[in-house]
Amino acid sequence: MAGFCREDILMEDNDILVVHKHAGMAVQNARMGQMDLEHALLNYLAKQARAETPGQARTQIPYLAVVHRLDQPVEGVLVFAKNKDAAGKLGRQVKDGTMKKEYLAVCEGKIEKQGVQKFEDFLVKDGRSNTSRVVQPGTAGAVSYTHLRAHETLMNL
């Protein structure tokens, strides 16, 4: 599993961190003895604060809010908030759908239809195992939409 390094920070200002998350790294709550991205970034911010104020004792934990997540096996880009104001604004963007998320995947098989295809599923989250599963429509599941468009067709993979 790849860990976190300084080069994984794609953009940083006073309000946000935009970070490349490697496949295999948990965003939060990694198993005991494993580093997750949230704590790696907290360590980075604490080290940065110590470097900016040498000789001063730093006991305050830096503020960092997870704005959205990616599953542990998924590689991608995440946005973290560095203060409460940014966390509130970014959280509203996630909630009202103005923050756009895109996923790219390599799939096996043939896509029959051209253009954008829309899939509707119903998901139930299991908090104990931190997993979600697809359930039948009309059950307790929350609706989830996936829009799929083939960008490229590769032969003989």
Regions found by a protein language model. Give the residues of each.
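Single conserved hydrophobic/aromatic residue that forms the stacking wall/gate
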Residues: H147, E152-L157
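RNA pseudouridine synthases
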Residues: M1-R149
